């Protein structure tokens, strides 16, 4: 009965909308009559005409939302209207966030989790995978060449450095045009907070927490340094965290790759690192050759802050910073001072009064003695006295936890990847390089681009169109279905997303030979979806051949961004071939790599009429697809396979990362369903780490 009443109210609302207004009292019997216009005024107040017009597409959604909330006559109208206003405002914000980027249809924005001079970071739901992600919008990246170079450096390094303790880029949205785009949208895995917030919000962290935190940081640093990459800006805010104690290093914008035959290994003059976590040799450009020890120092400062809950060296300027360092570590030896590069800094240290080092057991009275011994090594004033990340992992502090031979190392990065660092580039040059990085996450378009078959503009349905589709799907199912409509209800209907691209060569179209035409054909994309034959690239999962990813060269995305795992390129029934699926019963469609349609060369009115009739018959009966024999096969859509719910990554079985992932249970234990501090069979008792309560902060 309640369901029938609800449907009846829905119909009454719809009828009222169609008639231009409705009465609250007549529908619910609990409110005075109110027209649709007055209700809209309640929701939007005195907002501008432009804002009202932009939100006009959501008006019916508000009405239906209010109807659902008001099934109970005792519901409060003001509360319902306010809630509807928030939901529509969130939709409007999403449209403003994504602007004209077509991938907006794939993500549902939830809330802003970070803001800065670079742009905005929002949490979102990936509607393809149902996973939570963080989308970082970097706006006006080409306003300053230095900022654009930093963005290019970061997305390139995060593509090259794939490690569980380094934040992962899942996707980069394709811009509407490669020649004049200004913003980029980078999709990261979502992390709940950062280490700065964890330290600030928790005063009851245990020794196991401390150990596991440091272990993860050193493990990530070992991987980074084996690639000859120096992060140079490690600090708590650049270390993301989850409540399960998982840490991930982010923000590689100031990082550099050191090649043995380039000046970068000798001297860097640009600003590096936040002062509080900056190594002594960076405070005054002390040493002629920087080493990975600059990151080891930063890790030591972070670990000390974890132990005490406050920064170790909060210097107000460079001189104050040096004073704080020498107050704890003592005056450096004359041998160390003699190798200081900066003359002023050398004179200052030489004239400094003699200071004795403070015992770390006195500075950190409640800390584990083994932890303090390692910390003292990490904070050695002279960089040559600091251990490498690999040496630190073998310290007795990690006995029973670390298995250094199983920790992965990164293959050397090719010098060609960072050749742009040695040249003076224009904005257009950097724009092109960033676009090439974006194409790394769109494999088929990248292939077309490299073969010279890429168009400059891509067309997508707008976010508003997708919003309307979701509303229509809810309306048709009387509110009981999903808000996310199927890609296509019939196999013969065209896909919603179109990417302008030339056809795949015949050698990659095993079934296209039978469709070759002897008449002239048009190279224009089909503009009338009703005048074409329908072929679907959607084949049931059971008929698709699994494909194992081949090992890829360093610098190529692996795992989750592998494009064609559900079908072989040589398989005539694979997703890249034009296959008729009319023999299969109607089913929910999943996004495949390609679908094909035919573009007739010339058609008169009679032929168009016949084509329309044939198309309608095909849609109703689901018989064999109607086709024009004299036509040209062209690509209708290029979609990212990672969105498919049936997609599974298939990286190299012999890769060091895969081995490490399968061995994580050796280092971690589960406590109430979350990752806890790692233990080993060699330890007498199981040590446990509880969840860390954290709060959301600026991230990425």
UniProtKB/Swiss-Prot annotation:
Picking any one GO biological process from the record gives: intracellular signal transduction
Can you name one GO molecular function term for this protein?
ATP binding
Name which cysteines form disulfide bonds: none
Region named Disordered: 475-523
Which stretches are annotated as coiled coil? Answer: none
Record CDD domains: STKc_TDY_MAPK
Mind telling me which GO cellular component terms the entry cites? cytoplasm; nucleus
| Record-stated family | Belongs to the protein kinase superfamily. CMGC Ser/Thr protein kinase family. MAP kinase subfamily.
- The identity of this protein, by name, is Mitogen-activated protein kinase 9
Species: Oryza sativa subsp. japonica
Q: Upper taxonomic classification of the species?
A: Eukaryota, Viridiplantae, Streptophyta, Embryophyta, Tracheophyta
What is the gene name? MPK9
């Amino acid at each position: 009965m309640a369901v029938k009443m609800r449907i009846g109210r829905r119909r009454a609302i719809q009828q009222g909308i169609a008639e231009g207004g409705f009465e609250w009292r007549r529908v619910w019997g609990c409110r005075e009559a109110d027209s649709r216009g007055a209700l809209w005024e309640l929701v939007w107040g005195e907002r501008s005409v432009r804002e009202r017009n932009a939100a006009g597409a959501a008006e019916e959604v508000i009405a239906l939302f209010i109807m659902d909330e008001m099934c109970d006559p005792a519901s409060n109208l003001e509360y319902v209207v306010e809630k509807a206003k928030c939901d529509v405002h969130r939709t409007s914000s999403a449209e403003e966030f994504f602007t004209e980027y077509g991938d907006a249809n794939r993500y549902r924005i939830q809330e802003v989790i970070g803001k800065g001079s670079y742009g905005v970071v929002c949490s979102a739901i990936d509607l393809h995978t149902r996973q939570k992600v963080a989308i970082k919008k970097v706006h006006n990246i080409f306003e300053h060449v230095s900022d654009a170079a930093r963005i290019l450096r970061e997305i390139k390094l995060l593509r090259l450095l794939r490690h569980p303790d380094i934040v992962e880029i899942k996707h980069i949205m394709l811009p509407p045009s490669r020649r004049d785009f200004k913003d980029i949208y980078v999709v990261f895995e979502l992390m709940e907070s950062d280490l700065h917030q964890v330290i600030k919000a928790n005063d009851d962290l245990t020794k196991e927490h401390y150990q596991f935190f440091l272990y993860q940081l050193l493990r990530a640093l070992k991987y980074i340094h084996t690639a000859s990459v120096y992060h140079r800006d490690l600090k708590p805010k650049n270390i993301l965290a989850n409540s399960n104690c998982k840490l991930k290093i982010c923000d590689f914008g100031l990082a550099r790759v050191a090649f043995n035959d380039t000046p970068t290994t000798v001297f860097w003059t640009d600003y590096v690192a936040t002062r509080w976590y900056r190594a002594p040799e960076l405070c005054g450009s002390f040493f002629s050759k920087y080493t990975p020890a600059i990151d080891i120092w930063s890790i030591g400062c972070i670990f000390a802050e974890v132990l005490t809950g406050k920064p170790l060296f909060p210097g107000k300027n460079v001189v104050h910073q040096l004073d704080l360092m020498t107050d704890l570590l003592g005056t450096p030896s004359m041998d160390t001072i003699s190798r200081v590069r900066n003359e002023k800094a050398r004179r200052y240290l030489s004239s400094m009064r003699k200071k004795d080092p403070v015992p770390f057991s006195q500075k950190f009275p409640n800390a584990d003695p083994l932890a303090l011994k390692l910390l003292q090594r990490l904070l050695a004033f002279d960089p040559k006295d600091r251990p490498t990340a690999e040496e630190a992992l073998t310290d007795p502090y990690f006995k029973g936890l670390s298995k250094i031979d199983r920790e992965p190392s990164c293959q050397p990065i090719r010098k060609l990847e960072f050749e742009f660092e040695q040249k003076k580039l224009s904005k257009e040059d950097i724009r092109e390089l960033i676009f090439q990085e974006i194409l790394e996450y769109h494999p088929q378009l990248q292939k077309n681009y490299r073969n010279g078959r890429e168009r400059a503009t891509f067309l997508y349905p707008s976010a508003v169109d997708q919003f309307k589709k979701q509303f229509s799907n809810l309306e048709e199912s009387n509110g009981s279905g999903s808000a996310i409509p199927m890609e296509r209800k019939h196999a013969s209907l065209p896909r919603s997303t179109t990417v302008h691209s030339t056809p795949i060569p015949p050698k990659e179209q095993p079934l296209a030979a039978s469709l070759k035409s002897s008449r002239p054909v048009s190279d224009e994309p089909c503009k009338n979806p009703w005048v074409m034959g329908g072929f679907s690239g959607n084949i049931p999962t059971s008929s698709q051949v699994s494909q194992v990813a081949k090992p890829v060269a360093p610098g190529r995305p692996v795992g989750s961004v592998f494009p064609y795992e559900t079908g072989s390129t040589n398989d005539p029934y694979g997703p890249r071939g034009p296959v008729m699926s009319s023999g299969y019963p109607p089913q929910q469609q999943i996004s495949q790599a390609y679908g094909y349609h035919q573009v007739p060369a010339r058609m008169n009115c009679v032929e168009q009429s016949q084509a329309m009739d044939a198309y309608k018959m095909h849609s109703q009966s689901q018989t064999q697809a109607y086709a024009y024999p004299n036509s040209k096969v062209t690509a209708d859509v290029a979609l990212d396979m990672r969105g498919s719910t049936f997609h599974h990554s298939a990286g190299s079985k012999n890769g060091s990362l895969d081995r490490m992932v399968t061995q994580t249970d050796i280092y971690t234990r589960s406590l109430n369903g979350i990752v806890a501090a790692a233990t080993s069979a060699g330890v007498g008792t199981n040590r446990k780490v509880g969840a860390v309560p954290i709060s959301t902060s600026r991230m990425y």
